């Protein structure tokens, strides 16, 4: 979880590649691929954001029950929704917080979403005019505005592959 532009998709894709190259069955769910398909009927209201995260959790659980390692890369702005989504996985899930300042996220913004939000063209944009609840007890915090992509990926990989962390 983290703001738009914090590096969620970048880190998730690299981690997916690392696990795949080791022969694992893995799938990454990303905000863009679900918003353009399964969740295309949802907007960005409070209720729609809650429903978006609920659906993500359900889809991720289906993949996990089928034996996949599942990586989700979503803003997921509300703590209660993240908690519910993670509950489906019992002890075999990790909330990872990608921390980056709003200034850095805006500079990284390839789609110009922050600019549109600041101009009022996008309403309820997380971090601008809609809240983001920072995780209080994530399994790991990646400071993506202070460390390289490679450092973040290595920290994350080490955290989730510690003995006893992943079930086979």
Indicate residue ranges for each PLM-predicted region:
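Conserved beta-strand scaffold positions in the cores of enzyme catalytic domains, especially
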Residues: 28, 93-95, 139-141
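Conserved substrate/cofactor phosphate-moiety recognition/catalytic segment
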Residues: 6-58
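Hydrophobic pocket-lining residues that define ligand/cofactor binding sites across diverse proteins
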Residues: 19, 60-63, 160
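Generic alpha-helical structural signal
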Residues: 13, 53-57, 79, 83, ...
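ATP-dependent NMP and nucleoside kinases share a basic, alpha-helical "lid"
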Residues: 25, 37-48, 60-118, 124, ...
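Residues at the beta-strand->loop junction immediately N-terminal to the Walker
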Residues: 1-4
């Amino acid at each position: 979880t983290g703001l738009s532009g914090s590096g969620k998709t970048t880190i998730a894709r690299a981690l997916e590649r690392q696990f795949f190259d080791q022969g694992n069955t893995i799938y990454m769910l990303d905000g863009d691929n679900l918003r353009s398909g399964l969740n295309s009927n949802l907007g960005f209201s409070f209720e729609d954001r809650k429903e978006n995260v609920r659906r993500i959790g359900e889809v991720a659980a289906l993949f996990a029950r089928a034996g996949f390692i599942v990586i989700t890369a979503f803003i997921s702005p509300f703590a209660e929704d993240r908690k519910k989504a993670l509950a489906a996985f019992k002890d075999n899930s990790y909330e990872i917080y990608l921390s980056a300042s709003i200034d850095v996220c805006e500079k990284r913004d390839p789609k110009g979403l922050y600019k549109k939000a600041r101009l009022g063209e996008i309403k309820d944009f997380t971090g601008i005019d809609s809240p983001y609840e920072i995780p209080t007890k994530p399994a790991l915090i990646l400071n993506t505005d202070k460390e390289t992509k490679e450092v973040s990926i290595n920290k994350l990989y080490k955290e989730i592959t510690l003995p006893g962390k992943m079930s086979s």
